[in-house]
Every structure is written in structure tokens, then in C-alpha cells.
Regions:
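A short, GP-enriched loop/loop-strand-helix hinge that lies immediately N-terminal to
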Residues: 1-28, 41-51
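Residue-level recognition of oxygen-bearing side chains
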Residues: 32, 55, 88
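Short amphipathic alpha-helix with an adjacent loop that forms part of the alpha/beta core around
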Residues: 57-62
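Short, well-ordered alpha-helical microsegments
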Residues: 2-6, 56, 117-118
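Short acidic-glycine loop/turn motifs at beta-strand connectors
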Residues: 124-128
Length: 130
């Protein structure tokens, strides 16, 4: 879906149920979602975005632990590290930039939040809420 299959099928007037290319970025790009939360003041963990391992490691030298390091791409439920120290964090950054989970152009480093994770999926016609 992140490649736009829903958009393509809709252009062919084929009925399809799913998010369009832009909406699917909420699932496909962790960084897209973090920036969206930031833009609309949706509470989220503090974070940094890094395009290379050097800048990521510099940031990690002054961060608190544990932290969370994520590859910014679809990684089949993988590509997320909870790191307890600098050594684990450096290893996570290396593995992500070395392509362990596909070609990630960026790495997301965020504070670790303790608690239960919750996800919601909501289906709407765009105006009706029941």
C-alpha cells in the first residue's frame, strides 16, 4: 500500500478498501508519523532523526538510557531496538545503516516510554462517527 496500489486501483475505478499512498505512510514511515505528531501537537516521545551513522552516534553520546532506535522503513515488524547502553545503541545504528532491515535512509532515535502499547484502527466514511 505504501507504493500506491490503492491509488492505482481507484484510478482504474476498481473498488478497493485501504489507505491511499499518503495515508499508508503512517505505517510505512516511523519518521513521517513522528513529524505528523509534532506538527499537530500530538503527544509523542522526544526524538531525533538521523541521515547517517556519525550524527546518530554523536547524539547517542549524550542521551539517556534506555532508548529506542528504529529503522525508518517497513521492516516486517522488525527494525526496532530497545537499547540499555551506548554499546547496544551503536550496534543498532550500525545494523540499520548496514541494511539489516532493508534500505533505511534514516534512523529514528527516541526516548523510551514505559507502559502498555495501544493501537487503534478506525473505519469511517470521512464524516460519520458511530
Amino acid at each position: 500500500m505504501v507504493n500506491g496500489i490503492v491509488d492505482y486501483l481507484e484510478k482504474l475505478n476498481i473498488k478497493v478498501f485501504g489507505p491511499n499512498k499518503i495515508a499508508s505512510q503512517l505505517e510505512g514511515s516511523k519518521i513521517f508519523t513522528k513529524k505528523l505528531c509534532q506538527e499537530y501537537n500530538i503527544p509523542t516521545a522526544n526524538f531525533g532523526i538521523f541521515e547517517n551513522r556519525i550524527d546518530a552516534k554523536k547524539f547517542l553520546e549524550n542521551t539517556k538510557y534506555p532508548n529506542v532506535i528504529k529503522a525508518d522503513n517497513l521492516a516486517a515488524g522488525k527494525g526496532v531496538y530497545i537499547c540499555n547502553n551506548e554499546q547496544e545503541s551503536f550496534m543498532a545504528v550500525e545494523e540499520i545503516f548496514d541494511g539489516k532491515f532493508g534500505k533505511a535512509k534514516n534512523v529514528l532515535i527516541e526516548e523510551f516510554l514505559k507502559g502498555e502499547e495501544m493501537s487503534y484502527f478506525i473505519i469511517s466514511d470521512g464524516s460519520t462517527i458511530k
